[in-house]
Structure formats: structure tokens, C-alpha cells
Amino acid sequence: MSSFKIVVRKRRVTDRVIVLDASAVVAAFFDEPGADTVAEQMSGALMSAVNYAEVVAKLVDRGIPDSQILEVMAQLDVEVVPADRDQATIAGLLRAETRAAGLSLGDRSCLALAINRRGVALTMDRAWASLQLDVEILVAR
């Protein structure tokens, strides 16, 4: 079983709201490259419920016990935003612009929330850097 932690720092790279991709939260939990950047942005950030589910699933995949997953997820200082019709529509429409980069529904859900809230999408996925979208993307790795 892997160990993981939550590290939160309070320095922001922007005054705009940060929207966390699942890859960023997983990287922070397991102290992967770029975890410090994520930890600095995590407090008060937003996360789509779709991405929240992805993080839980990744922890399950790594063999973390359910009770530990529930405990660590409850400690996250993030606002989990339910997916609504507007976000779902944006995520669906993003398919054409993101297909070549291989973005998943979860990835597009993060971007849709960032677009909807005029925020900054924070990810570990370098493929996002090549996207030409009307949203700011911060690749932490």
C-alpha cells in the first residue's frame, strides 16, 4: 500500500480561482513532480465532482483502504462543484478541440468548470499546454 499526504501552502500564482484536475490532486497526494506547485494552489480551489470521483478511483486503484480515502478526501480544502447542464455542454463541445490531445471526459470537465468560472485549470498533463482554448491552463509538471 502506498502512503500519501496532503500538503497545503497559501501562496497563489494568480488571484483567479484555481480549478483542479484530478491529475494535480493525485500528484499532490503522492508527492510527484510538481506537487509543490499544486499544494501552493490547492487551498480554496474548485474541483468538478467528476474530477473528485476520478481522484477517489485513482486511490482505489492504488489499493488505499476505503476508510483512508474517505478521511483524506474529507480533509481537502477545496469546493467540489456538482456538474450541471452548462458544464456538461461545455465539456461535450470541447471534444472537437481536444480530441487530438487525447483529453478524457474528466479532463474536459475540469476545463469546462474553469471556463464557466473564468478560472485557471491546474493539471499535470503536459498535453494540455498545446491546447488553444479560451481558458488559462497551468501545467504544474
Residue ranges and their predicted role:
Residues 18, 44-47, 76-80, 120:
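Short loop->beta-strand "edge-of-pocket" segments that line small-molecule binding or catalytic clefts
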Residues 1-13, 17, 111, 115-141:
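Acidic, PIN/NYN-like endoribonuclease modules and their adjacent C-terminal/linker elements
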Residues 20-21, 47-48, 103-105, 125-126, ...:
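Histidine- and aromatic-rich ligand-binding microenvironments
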Residues 2-7, 81-122:
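Active-site neighborhoods of divalent-metal-dependent phosphate/nucleic-acid chemistry enzymes
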Residues 35, 52, 66, 88-91:
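A general structural signal for well-ordered alpha-helical segments in protein cores
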Residues 1-47, 59-71:
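Short, well-structured N-terminal submotif of metal-dependent ribonuclease cores
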Residues 24-25, 51, 87, 109-110, ...:
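Alpha-helix capping/helix-boundary segments
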